[in-house]
Amino acid sequence: MYIDLHTHSTASDGTLTPTDLMRAAKAAGLSAIALTDHDTGNGLKEAAAEAARLGDLQFVPGIEISADYPAPGTLHILGHFIDPDSPALNRMSTLLLEARNARNPRIVERLNELGCRITMEQVEGIAREKAPPGADVVIGRPHIAEALVRANCVATIKQAFDAYLGTTGAAFFPKERLTPRQAIECIHDAGGLATIAHPVQLKTDNPAHLATVVNHLAEAGMDGIEVWHCDHDERATALMLELSKKYNLIPTGGSDFHGSHKPDVVLGRGRCNLRVPASVLPPLEAKWKQRRHTEFV
């Protein structure tokens, strides 16, 4: 049996609703799935309800938080087994949502200066189309990218990011981020475990430097590291597994599925280059239960 501990829905920048994502996981034969939308837990209750209805599909409530890290790399931190009703999580989500809301109009304004005629109203409409029923609308760059496609400014979402919205794009603006320690503490305060997501995106070709970064994050309270990911080749996977053992981090893995926004990434399979065995989940769950027990003793 296989699992997927890194996926996204329409609650952030995925294209499947939380309900449809659970159905896709069931159809793919997965035994467990985590929903880890960017900076929000809005889709978790819907996903949990559908997973329970389907049966034989363990649901892990999660989140993915962007943390401050020097360019050109990026640091994302996954939270697993978080409490969707946590006040700490809600405060953090509100803070990051406000940061997104401040950035999005600047991006649209810059795009108009570059000749791409789209409006925030169009972007908001696209975000509403894709949001789960009753959930707060979280607007992100994928919604702006979709507006660019609909306005015939670009042919594809990928082209929108390459030309305008990615970190080297002409309309890119950085957003406010938590420090790594703040992100880890927020996840812990929400009852979850913190994991380094896709470590290759830290963008360091120096294994010694990568080890130093991972060590610092472990010392800051990190619980795990994503060993299996669609961006990891065999060499990277082996290196991350080695680092997990060296710094006593629980190895995790997932496809980073986004639906049609990443059409080459398949749920549970990545780019057909990964299978995360179900045996990965029990150690993560055991540490979560141990932490909960410690908190209540």
State each model region's role.
Residues 1-72, 165-166, 184-185, 190-262:
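An N-terminally biased module of ancient metal coordination in phosphate/nucleic-acid-related enzymes
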Residues 26, 115, 243-247, 271, ...:
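Generic low-complexity, intrinsically disordered sequence content enriched
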Residues 52-212, 216, 275-297:
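Extended substrate/RNA-proximal surfaces in nucleic-acid metabolism proteins
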Residues 265-277:
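Conserved, well-ordered active-site substructure
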